From Swiss-Prot:
One of its GO terms (molecular function) is hydrolase activity. It is found in: Cytoplasm. Ca(2+) 2 binds at S109, G111, D129, T132, Y134. Its EC number is 3.1.1.-. It comes from Staphylococcus aureus (strain MSSA476). Exhibits lactonase activity. Acts in cells with perturbed membrane integrity and is possibly related to the membrane homeostasis. This is Lactonase drp35. Belongs to the SMP-30/CGR1 family.
Amino acid sequence: MMSQQDLPTLFYSGKSNSAVPIISESELQTITAEPWLEISKKGLQLEGLNFDRQGQLFLLDVFEGNIFKINPETKEIKRPFVSHKANPAAIKIHKDGRLFVCYLGDFKSTGGIFAATENGDNIQDIIEDFSTTYCIDDMVFDSKGGFYFTDFRGYSTNPLGGVYYVAPDFRTVTPIIQNISVANGIALSKDEKVLWVTETTANRLHRIALEDDGVTIQPFGATIPYYFTGHEGPDSCCIDSDDNLYVAMYGQGRVLVFNKRGYPIGQILIPGRDEGHMLRSTHPQFIPDTNQLIICSNDIEMGGGSMLYTVNGFAKGHQSFQFQ
């Protein structure tokens, strides 16, 4: 009979040495991002990257509510204002220059959206927290000036979240899909016929084909082209001018890239991820008129700071509503 010390034994080697091993996507084209700018030596939950018409970068930190403005040429960091609403999660810029800020509130039922100037003045409630039960995480404008937003509620066995469309007059809210678990990132294809949505706690990517009215789903048009693996799950996303989709993987320190049909075609790794550093990658966004992608992440679990990283993507970023 074989002694215990002679039994076959598992060892940590190869992929099992990583804090966040990549299994199903290990054969994809893979590049590692370069550090671009340190936002803070403190771990801040960075999110909401968006560029204005002058090429200035806006972003926020969720838990403290700081709104940051960065000059990409000088790397100067300013903090023009602090959100008056709890747990802001995304910034989108209207073509009139106003910032639309999504906020999560109490993470249960007090989220909403407000608009303000870049200095935080002239605040207008777009979706009020006291008259709805949404927990709003992200949004994307269409060319008419309406927008889609994600409802971040629920968990894996209690899918309360969904996706809604708000008409350009901001008065009518129409449900697109419902009963999903923590709807998070959202992006709209160049022709505005395909809506992409990430479902974080179910680890799924939704591809929703829309009719011309922008709210009716085409027959058999709501599909799930991809199931992610690992903890935690897909976060914010954006498209490039080839209609490729870039999805930040929260808790994994990487960005996955999909073609317009939802097939994975590449991935971007954050340095230090195998050792468990900078895993909270939340949002990718292109510098306008370039293929240079900026990615935000932080190292809260390991006591590190908050960083922006950069790579070149497959194509230039898509010039969305604020540039039209």
